[in-house]
Amino acid sequence: VPIRDELIQRTIQQIANLLARLVTGRAGHDITAAELREAEQELDELYLANLGSSRALIHRLGTEDLLGVLRTSGTVHAERAYVLGALLATEGAVVAAHHGADDPQALSLRESALDILLEAGAARVGEPDLRERVDDLVRHAPPAGWPAARFERLFRFEHAMGAFARAETALFTWLERVEGMQARLEVADAANAFYDELLTLEDADLAKGDFSRDEVHEGRADLAERFAELLGG
């Protein structure tokens, strides 16, 4: 279900306007230091209004700490996660427009934004532009360097989005990236739940996720085989 909170809707519109003014509408021209400071002040006000925390405090918190702030009874608040991810992504784009796309701060902001937006999607935030936002961040943070935890988030995101083939790809990569028996058992548990759920769906619903009933059985067998190989190695 799309967001109906008026504050969040206004925030999304404000950051869209900010991006249009300083990034997408600049035809490749870098923004000035003064424009960067002005944008940071505007973003600071938006962080405070939506999350009750300053931009500086948000920067000091790691992804897990940020997610802890967004959780209620163990569940991530989807709308707040979405707006935080959008704010971080916007700040990353603005910093990159001044310092360059390879700037460490820009990369860090974009990676944090990606993690938060994946969690928002896994919590079924329902925003129509979420896929576009995630894909844009992936272009700036290629999967080759991702930690295992991000593939776990990607798996849950794609599963929640109904993109079952993509979810399975993330699942297998997650298995390859984790280390240790306990971590691999957690992947196996997630895989069993995933395939069990898919078997309850109609063929038409599986097809919408680029999957088939035969592929459910094949995927389960392939993952079990790879799991055994990793344990034996």
Task: Give the location of each predicted region.
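Charge-dense, low-complexity intrinsically disordered regions
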Residues: E152-F155, H159
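Solenoid-like repeat scaffolds
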Residues: R139-A144, W174-G180
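N-terminal alpha-helical interaction modules that lie
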Residues: V1-G100, L107-V125, M161-R177, L201-G233
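Short, structured interface segments
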Residues: P128-P142
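Generic helix N-cap/helix-start motif at coil->alpha-helix transitions
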Residues: T11, A144-F151, E186
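Alpha-helical tetratricopeptide repeat
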Residues: Y82, F151-E152
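Alpha-helical protein-protein interaction modules
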Residues: E168, R184-A204
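Intrinsically disordered, low-complexity segments enriched in charged and polar residues
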Residues: P2, L19, R156, Q182-A190, ...
